[in-house]
């Protein structure tokens, strides 16, 4: 079976118009320059086997496909600007006879011979064809599509490729079949086989990393051995030591900059450094310069840099830490001062007038130690004006002389610190406030409060009681009502002494007549037993070790003692007292704590006789001088009982007025005054006259660490009946108790106050709620509430003053104020 028969029996394949569709733009057949189409290629291959009576349809069965004639008109180009190169669609005529196909230009189609165009096209059809401007897909007939199209592009069918392969075989040429398609140019037919003949594209670089050297380098690991590997031509073998040597430590950096300047080349910057480097490099030149006697500076032609005068504080402070750069001094020479005599003479004359005297030295910054010493000598004022040292207002009012300047100076000397101590302490808030009166850091020393000297204000505080010889029968005195002093060691007979002196810490209470005691209505003082000398000696030694009563001191004295311990001034009196008590306890913590003798604190004996005695002070008579003796010394011997009773009978005005240590005696104007009235040191102008007098007298009754000073007779006004009255049992217990617990009682009373109900929707907060809400506390209202209701809730019978309440508020950090007078 031939190749033609095989192609006829194949399955019918689509026509070129069906493959490319209407998307392919047809080109006129009579165009001058066009690309070969698929149909022309197929005709060139199957030219000898093509049947003239059958249409040229690629891949179509010629037997089954009916033959129709197609009349083609010349391509009419559209006149519109957008359709210059678009041909008009060809028309098909169904009236044509079978077997006649003509192309548009009159050529013979494969199905028939050439026929004239006028016979096949009527004028009406020709006019209708020219009116059409759009180009669409050709109308399909019932048979095969016989339109010959010239395709654009370079697409090649797979069937054409297979046919081209089969065309290479020798095929017999049939007679009677004319050749319809001319052969194409040989250049146009070979482009498919040869390709586009473009240059190959360069390989794209995805990174700019340098190309690695793929050449192998031979490393000689056996450098010491005699055998060596064969060397590669053009490259020497590298040793392993040379490769590792680059990772070793190099004493001299290879990147060090070398001196590019010659030795004689002068530079403007870093002249001294360059000179020093050049002179050190060549020692031979230095020796030659020394031999010639000229300085290398002069040989090189460079001038030495003059040192600039220091004029700023920064340069002065950093001068001692700077490096001294003086290379000229390393080359001493006699001829170094020789310079050309022209300009040098003028400069020397100018410098001669500006020379300073030899004795005057340049100003230099003092060393650190000298600066610290100078700071020690400066006077600092630390704190506000209220904290500076000044005389208290209490001393001005009461007329108490201030402490001597020597004691203040000694206190300052004790608080002096070392030179560098203030720079060694830790810098915190406590260190900043821990200052003494001089402003330096406080250095606390232990002060001996027992052996302290007696102040001058207390030296002449002995009360002298003169005695006169009068008839004892007129006054009704009896020798049986004599009350012996319990502090007397013994009773001896002495008739030469006519007056009795009262020592510090001793009490002399003579007996008084019964009728006066009955008229006055004062409680009687029962007779007490006489103590032996051994008991009194033990009581004196025990009293020396007891704590002094700081509450009898004035505020100014307390402030001085607090300053003596090295503390800063404290406003609160209670705080100063508690601080002094703690300081005294810390000094005597090694010794066993001892209390006052029992005979000094006990109330009057209940087993005494029911005799009533009234003590009246005598303001007349002669004065006798007596010396004050310290309590540490042995007490003097007193008069015998007979002499004491005789002096008591001598006159009606002879009285020994004294006060017992725990039981303070009051000198009231009014007999109805309460005996348990507390003593307030700071007077208040708003208080009554009786309270102010008690305060004034209580402030004068001060105690020291070793002795007690009773009331002076000069401070008692004349012409007023003053009576001594002993204190009852209740008042004694109240006085002996520590008044510092009154602050605790105030705190308990405020916390114990119950919550109050609201009135008409208005809440009534308690004192504790007001304090917690930082409301201002009226001192008058709080004092009235404490005295009427608050202290009664905690079982406290004492009353507090407004000053006490104010001190309590300040100690707790409570906002308090006085009411404004209306």
UniProtKB/Swiss-Prot annotation:
<keyword id="KW-0234">DNA repair</keyword>
<feature type="compositionally biased region" description="Basic residues">
    <location>
        <begin position="342"/>
        <end position="354"/>
    </location>
</feature>
<protein>
    <recommendedName>
        <fullName>Structure-specific endonuclease subunit SLX4</fullName>
    </recommendedName>
</protein>
<feature type="compositionally biased region" description="Basic residues">
    <location>
        <begin position="627"/>
        <end position="636"/>
    </location>
</feature>
<dbReference type="GO" id="GO:0006260">
    <property type="term" value="P:DNA replication"/>
</dbReference>
<feature type="compositionally biased region" description="Low complexity">
    <location>
        <begin position="460"/>
        <end position="470"/>
    </location>
</feature>
<comment type="similarity">
    <text>Belongs to the SLX4 family.</text>
</comment>
<feature type="compositionally biased region" description="Polar residues">
    <location>
        <begin position="310"/>
        <end position="320"/>
    </location>
</feature>
<keyword id="KW-0227">DNA damage</keyword>
<dbReference type="GO" id="GO:0006310">
    <property type="term" value="P:DNA recombination"/>
</dbReference>
<feature type="region of interest" description="Disordered">
    <location>
        <begin position="456"/>
        <end position="507"/>
    </location>
</feature>
<dbReference type="InterPro" id="IPR018574">
    <property type="entry name" value="Structure-sp_endonuc_su_Slx4"/>
</dbReference>
<dbReference type="GO" id="GO:0017108">
    <property type="term" value="F:5'-flap endonuclease activity"/>
</dbReference>
<feature type="region of interest" description="Disordered">
    <location>
        <begin position="1"/>
        <end position="39"/>
    </location>
</feature>
<feature type="compositionally biased region" description="Low complexity">
    <location>
        <begin position="490"/>
        <end position="506"/>
    </location>
</feature>
<feature type="compositionally biased region" description="Polar residues">
    <location>
        <begin position="13"/>
        <end position="39"/>
    </location>
</feature>
<keyword id="KW-0597">Phosphoprotein</keyword>
<feature type="compositionally biased region" description="Low complexity">
    <location>
        <begin position="637"/>
        <end position="650"/>
    </location>
</feature>
<dbReference type="GO" id="GO:0033557">
    <property type="term" value="C:Slx1-Slx4 complex"/>
</dbReference>
<dbReference type="Pfam" id="PF09494">
    <property type="entry name" value="Slx4"/>
</dbReference>
<feature type="region of interest" description="Disordered">
    <location>
        <begin position="277"/>
        <end position="362"/>
    </location>
</feature>
<feature type="compositionally biased region" description="Polar residues">
    <location>
        <begin position="471"/>
        <end position="484"/>
    </location>
</feature>
<dbReference type="GO" id="GO:0006281">
    <property type="term" value="P:DNA repair"/>
</dbReference>
<comment type="function">
    <text>Regulatory subunit of the SLX1-SLX4 structure-specific endonuclease that resolves DNA secondary structures generated during DNA repair and recombination. Has endonuclease activity towards branched DNA substrates, introducing single-strand cuts in duplex DNA close to junctions with ss-DNA.</text>
</comment>
<feature type="region of interest" description="Disordered">
    <location>
        <begin position="73"/>
        <end position="117"/>
    </location>
</feature>
<keyword id="KW-0539">Nucleus</keyword>
<dbReference type="InterPro" id="IPR027784">
    <property type="entry name" value="Slx4_ascomycetes"/>
</dbReference>
<feature type="region of interest" description="Disordered">
    <location>
        <begin position="390"/>
        <end position="418"/>
    </location>
</feature>
<feature type="region of interest" description="Disordered">
    <location>
        <begin position="589"/>
        <end position="676"/>
    </location>
</feature>
<keyword id="KW-0233">DNA recombination</keyword>
<feature type="compositionally biased region" description="Low complexity">
    <location>
        <begin position="280"/>
        <end position="294"/>
    </location>
</feature>
<feature type="compositionally biased region" description="Polar residues">
    <location>
        <begin position="589"/>
        <end position="612"/>
    </location>
</feature>
<comment type="subunit">
    <text>Forms a heterodimer with SLX1.</text>
</comment>
């Amino acid at each position: 079976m031939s190749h033609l028969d095989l192609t006829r029996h194949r399955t019918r394949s689509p026509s070129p118009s069906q493959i490319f569709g209407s998307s392919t733009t047809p080109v006129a057949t009579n165009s001058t320059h066009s690309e070969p189409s698929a149909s022309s290629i197929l005709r060139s291959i199957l030219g000898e086997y093509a049947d003239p009576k059958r249409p040229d349809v690629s891949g179509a069965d010629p037997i089954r496909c009916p033959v129709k004639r197609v009349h083609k008109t010349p391509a009419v180009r559209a006149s519109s600007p957008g359709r210059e190169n678009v041909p008009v669609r060809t028309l098909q005529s169904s009236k044509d006879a079978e077997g006649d196909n003509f192309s548009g230009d009159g050529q013979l189609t494969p199905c028939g011979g050439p026929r004239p165009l006028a016979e096949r096209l009527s004028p009406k059809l020709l006019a209708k064809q020219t009116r059409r401007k759009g180009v669409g897909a050709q109308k399909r007939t019932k048979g095969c599509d016989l339109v010959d199209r010239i395709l654009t592009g370079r697409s090649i069918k797979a069937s054409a490729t297979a046919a081209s392969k089969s065309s290479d075989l020798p095929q017999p040429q049939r007679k009677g079949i004319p050749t319809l398609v001319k052969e194409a140019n040989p250049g146009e037919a070979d482009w498919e086989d040869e390709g586009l003949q473009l240059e190959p594209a360069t390989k794209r670089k995805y990174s700019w990393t340098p190309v690695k050297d793929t050449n192998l380098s031979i490393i000689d690991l056996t450098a010491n051995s005699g055998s060596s590997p064969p060397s590669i031509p053009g490259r020497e073998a590298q040793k392993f030591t040379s490769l590792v040597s680059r990772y070793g430590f190099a004493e001299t950096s290879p990147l060090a900059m070398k001196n590019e300047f010659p030795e004689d080349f002068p530079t403007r910057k870093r002249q001294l450094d360059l000179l020093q480097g050049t002179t050190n490099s060549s020692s031979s030149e230095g020796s030659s310069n020394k031999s010639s006697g000229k300085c290398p500076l002069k040989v090189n032609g460079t001038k030495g840099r003059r040192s600039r005068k220091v004029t700023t504080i920064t340069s002065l402070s950093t001068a001692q830490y700077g490096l001294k750069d003086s290379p000229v001094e390393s080359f001493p020479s006699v001829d170094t001062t020789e310079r050309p005599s022209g300009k040098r003479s003028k400069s020397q004359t100018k410098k001669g007038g500006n020379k300073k005297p030899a004795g005057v030295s340049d100003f230099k910054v003092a060393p650190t130690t000298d600066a610290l010493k100078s700071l020690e000598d400066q006077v600092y004022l630390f704190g506000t004006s209220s904290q500076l040292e000044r005389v208290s207002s209490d001393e001005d009012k009461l007329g108490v002389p201030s402490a001597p300047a020597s004691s203040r100076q000694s206190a300052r000397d004790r608080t002096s610190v070392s030179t560098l101590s203030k720079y060694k302490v830790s810098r915190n808030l406590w260190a900043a406030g821990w200052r003494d009166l001089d402003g330096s850091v406080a250095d606390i020393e232990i002060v001996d409060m027992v052996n302290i000297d007696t102040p001058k204000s207390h030296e002449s505080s002995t009360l002298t009681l003169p005695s006169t010889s009068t008839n004892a029968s007129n006054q009704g005195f009896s020798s049986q009502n004599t009350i012996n002093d319990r502090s007397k060691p013994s009773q001896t007979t002495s008739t030469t002494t006519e007056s009795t002196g009262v020592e510090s810490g001793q009490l002399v209470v003579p007996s008084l007549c019964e009728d006066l005691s009955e008229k006055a209505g004062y409680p009687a003082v029962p007779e007490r037993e006489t103590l032996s000398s051994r008991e009194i000696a033990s009581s004196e030694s025990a009293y020396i070790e007891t704590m002094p009563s700081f509450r009898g001191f004035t505020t100014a004295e307390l402030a001085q003692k607090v300053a003596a311990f090295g503390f800063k001034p404290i406003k609160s009196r209670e705080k100063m007292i508690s601080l002094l008590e703690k300081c005294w306890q810390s000094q005597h913590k090694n010794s066993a704590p001892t209390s006052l003798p029992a005979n000094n604190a006990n109330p009057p004996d209940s087993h005494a006789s029911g005799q009533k005695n009234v003590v009246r002070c005598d303001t007349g008579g002669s004065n006798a001088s007596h010396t004050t003796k310290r309590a540490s010394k042995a007490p003097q011997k007193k008069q015998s009982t007979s002499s004491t009773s005789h002096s008591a009978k001598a006159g009606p005005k002879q009285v020994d007025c004294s006060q017992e240590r725990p039981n303070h005696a009051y000198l009231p104007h009014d007999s109805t005054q309460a005996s348990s009235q507390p003593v307030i040191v700071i007077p208040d102008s708003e208080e009554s006259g009786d309270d102010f007098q008690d305060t004034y007298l209580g402030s004068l009754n001060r105690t020291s660490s070793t002795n007690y000073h009773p009331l002076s007779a000069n401070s008692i006004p004349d012409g007023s009946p003053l009576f001594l009255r002993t204190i009852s049992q209740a008042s004694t217990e109240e006085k002996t108790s520590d008044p510092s617990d009154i602050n605790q009682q105030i705190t308990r009373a405020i916390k114990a106050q119950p919550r109050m109900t609201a009135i008409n929707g208005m809440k009534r907060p308690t004192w504790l709620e007001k304090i917690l809400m930082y409301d201002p506390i009226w001192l008058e209202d709080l004092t009235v509430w404490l005295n009427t209701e608050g202290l009664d809730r905690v079982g406290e019978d004492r009353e507090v003053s407004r000053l006490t309440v104010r001190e309590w508020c300040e100690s707790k950090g409570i906002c308090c104020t006085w009411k404004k007078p209306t």
